[in-house]
Every structure is written in C-alpha cells, then in structure tokens.
C-alpha cells in the first residue's frame, strides 16, 4: 500500500508551506536593548514614501491644479470630511493626526502586497509590512488612546473623568474596561487582518504559483485600504466621543 508514503509526502509539503517565518525577528543590539530592526526598516521606507510624496505635492503648487496636485487635494479633502463627520465642528486640530494615521497604515498595508520585501535577506526573519507586526499596531492604538484622553482633558479638564460614572456609578468598572478594550480591538483587528492576508498569499503562491494568487492579491489591496479607513474612522470617533462626553 502506498497510502502511508503519500500521506507522509503530503504532510511534508504542508510543513514546508507552514514554514513561513511568522515569529522570527531580526534585532539590533544597542547598548543593553534589543531593537526590532525589521519594523524599523520597513517603517522608515513607508515614512520616506510619505515624506517624498508630500514634498512633491507642495513643491510647485498651481492655481489650476495638475493631475498630481488634484490627487493630493482629494486625499486631504477626504481626510477632512472623515474627521469632521466623526469629531464634529472642532475637527480642525485633529486633521493632521487622523491623516497621519490613515496614510501611514494605508501605505504600510499596501507595501506588504506591492513591495518585494522578501528579496532582501536577513539573518533572522524576513521583511514585511510594518502593520504585519503586533508592535506597530499596538503602538498606533496606544497613540490613539493618548489622543482621545488628551482631547477629553483639553475640552473638559478633570470633569472628563465624570463620564466613568455616567449614566450610573454601577457602570464604573465597565466604563474603565472600555478604555482597555478600545486599543486592544484596534491593534488586534489591524494586525490580524494584515497578517492573515499575507499568509494566505504566501500559501497560495506555494501551492499554485501562477494566476490563482492574483485575484487574492487584488482582494488584499482592497481589504488593506478598508482596514486603514476603519482604523482612522474609529480613531476619529473615539476622539469625538471623548470631546462630546456621550457613548
């Protein structure tokens, strides 16, 4: 019977496919600290793309916008509308924060699908989208938490903490717990979706190298953009909620 050898070969093939280095990391040793180099390298590339694009956008503005200037003005208007819808009339000071979050996450997500990170060999692990790492998404979520605390305290002072006993003091533990669940949901939603998308593409390429992975890659680009929009929308909604003081 050839059932056992076939089963062993199948398991071996699945093991090779599952050998994607998800938990492997490349570190820089600086003093007594280990710095997660993979995330820094890819984040610097994303930041360079954003800064380069911004420099091109403002280099020579025209009264009658060109195609490139039209695109950047559309992006800015989109971010303003998003901020105004979620935050309200006091949205102005928060447009740079919401815009930075949206653009960084959007470009990071797309870089995982469009940039050939895998051709750069590292001693350990491999390069991937910055948002493919839980450290990045947690940092973004904590920045969002700090932003909505700052917004609430700036607007209401110490009276901001009165929201924890509204509409009744019985809800105090739940209201406190909510401040922990917000960054958790933001970070794990973004991390899980981007990681799953990249793993699905890697597995499909390993199984069927031609044609089949292409629709999945396009779907990944779409969902990557949606995830950036969801994160920015929720961040703006949390800031607006803290300034208004209602749930």
UniProtKB/Swiss-Prot annotation:
Say where the protein is mainly found: plastid
- Sample GO molecular function, one term: proton-transporting ATP synthase activity, rotational mechanism
Query: What membrane topology term does the record carry?
Result: Multi-pass membrane protein
**Gene name, Swiss-Prot/TrEMBL:** atpI
Q: Which Pfam families match?
A: ATP-synt_A
> Can you tell me which family this protein belongs to?
Belongs to the ATPase A chain family.
What is the designated name of this protein? ATP synthase subunit a, chloroplastic
**Summary of subunit composition and partner proteins:** F-type ATPases have 2 components, CF(1) - the catalytic core - and CF(0) - the membrane proton channel. CF(1) has five subunits: alpha(3), beta(3), gamma(1), delta(1), epsilon(1). CF(0) has four main subunits: a, b, b' and c.
Compartment(s) where it occurs, according to its Swiss-Prot or TrEMBL record: Plastid, Chloroplast thylakoid membrane
Secretion signal, residue range per the UniProt entry: none
* Keywords from the named record: ATP synthesis, CF(0), Chloroplast, Hydrogen ion transport, Ion transport, Membrane, Plastid, Thylakoid, Transmembrane, Transmembrane helix, Transport
């Amino acid at each position: 019977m050839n059932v056992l050898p076939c089963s062993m070969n199948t398991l071996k093939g699945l093991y090779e496919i599952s050998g994607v280095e998800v938990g492997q990391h490349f570190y820089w040793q600086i003093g007594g600290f280990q710095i997660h180099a993979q995330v820094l390298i890819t984040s610097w590339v994303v930041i360079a793309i954003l800064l380069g694009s911004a420099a091109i956008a403002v280099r020579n503005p025209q009264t009658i916008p060109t195609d490139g200037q039209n695109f950047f003005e559309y992006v800015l208007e989109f971010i303003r509308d998003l901020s105004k819808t979620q935050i309200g009339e006091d949205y102005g000071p928060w447009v740079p924060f919401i815009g930075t979050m949206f653009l960084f996450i959007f470009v990071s997500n797309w870089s995982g699908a469009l940039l050939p990170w895998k051709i750069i060999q590292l001693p350990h692990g491999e390069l991937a989208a910055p948002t493919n790492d839980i450290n990045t998404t947690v940092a973004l979520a904590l920045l969002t938490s700090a932003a909505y605390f700052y917004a609430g305290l700036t607007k209401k002072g110490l009276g901001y903490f009165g929201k924890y006993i509204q509409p009744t003091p019985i809800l105090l533990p739940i209201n406190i717990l909510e401040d922990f669940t917000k960054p958790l949901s933001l970070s794990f939603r973004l991390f899980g979706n981007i990681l799953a998308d990249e793993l699905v593409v890697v597995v499909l390429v390993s199984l069927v190298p031609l044609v089949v992975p292409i629709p999945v890659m396009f779907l990944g680009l779409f969902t990557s953009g949606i995830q950036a929009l969801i994160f920015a929308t929720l961040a703006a909604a949390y800031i607006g909620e803290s300034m208004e003081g209602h749930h």
